[in-house]
């Protein structure tokens, strides 16, 4: 029986008779040869947990045959179906559903389908479980207390085929939770490239913002996923709505059957992974160039540095394809500071706006440089066997890195000096008795004097009229 244990040890299992809590033991306990009708309710609960833990379908059926209610709940509210779904045991789920278990059951708005979508098991098992639950009318649009849907749980875990299955059964792809996160935002936050691509293919809106005003691209950047940031920042929405007009059956078939056939030779993953180059080309609807670029061993970084003449040399002759790539590269390029446009000498007429603009550009450039280094770090080969071409001596690279660190420190020191000078200038201006006040202050003082004079004149005029009327009456 020990050989029938499946998956990680999560809710379900044997409990000692001395336990006051409704806890779960993970160890193996011997199964009785035959269940007795006289078993107490507590004993049946213990045997039921054992059946769920070990994945023992025959023991579960014996319990149900002995009179145990299929939707009986444990002390903390979960039903057997909820436990079976949480470990994505499709055999147990099928037995319980066939016996009348409620596929739409929820505890504190957490549904059975949500439990399956967040299971810590291989995606293939989750797919089978979710498909079975959906066939028994489990709602793909139910939300938990935080308004998260099963689709958001699937996207958060990076299950791309599960995402396709849920959307194929009517899940709202652009629904938002309490924080304004969509399924796309959740996938971007956790760096799931394949899931992001799948959601974009299915029509996810990458312009929707969270409650704090962040788009999926900005979320990816904040969580240090530069490739996703680049892809989501493109003007075009990659393959937007490409599969929105096909039927539910065609949708499910398209994203489940074909992908599973491709991955038969790969034991653990049921979906194929996409590299940076593939994602970039998908984003521009240029998938047909993938094989061409791979044959010529052109990486994404090399592609981003090509010029118009280079495209023709490598076989990209279509003008529209060339323009798409160049427009995308132009959009992703770092804005360079044109130092030659700055005044050579600091003159008195050098405006504060120009100086502020220089500082803002300098700060932006430093931010871009930091992002570029983070990008290199995230893709740097950790193991030497992953390096295809022979590299030079590491001392050469470390020496340049030391120069970079030294230059960065010098930049920090110089900026600190500049800040000190600005503060000193500000203090000198405040303490200078001969300083001419700004025109705004002068004009404001004159306006006040004119207002006072006008009020005084009006007051004297009103007093004169009152006195004259009083004199005439007498």
Curated annotation (Swiss-Prot):
Record's GO cellular component terms: pi-body
Residues bearing the modification Phosphoserine: 16-17, 19
Region: Disordered, residue numbers: 1-31
Keyword Glycosyltransferase: no
Keyword Iron listed: no
PROSITE patterns noted in UniProt: ANK_REP_REGION, ANK_REPEAT, SAM_DOMAIN
SMART domains hit by this protein: ANK (SM00248), SAM (SM00454)
Domain of life of the organism encoding this protein: Eukaryota
Matching Pfam families: Ank, Ank_2, SAM_2
GO biological process, one term: regulatory ncRNA-mediated gene silencing
Alphabetized UniProt keyword annotations: ANK repeat, Cytoplasm, Developmental protein, Differentiation, Meiosis, Phosphoprotein, Repeat, RNA-mediated gene silencing, Spermatogenesis
InterPro entries recorded: Ankyrin_rpt, Ankyrin_rpt-contain_sf, Asz1_SAM, SAM, SAM/pointed_sf
Subcellular location: Cytoplasm
Repeat region (ANK), residues: 43-72, 76-105, 108-142, 146-175, 179-208, 212-241
Domain SAM: 270-333
Alphabetized PANTHER family for the sequence: ANKYRIN REPEAT, SAM AND BASIC LEUCINE ZIPPER DOMAIN-CONTAINING PROTEIN 1
Biological function: Plays a central role during spermatogenesis by repressing transposable elements and preventing their mobilization, which is essential for the germline integrity. Acts via the piRNA metabolic process, which mediates the repression of transposable elements during meiosis by forming complexes composed of piRNAs and Piwi proteins and governs the methylation and subsequent repression of transposons. Its association with pi-bodies suggests a participation in the primary piRNAs metabolic process.
Subunit structure: Interacts with DDX4, PIWIL1, RANBP9 and TDRD1.
The protein's name in its UniProt record: Ankyrin repeat, SAM and basic leucine zipper domain-containing protein 1
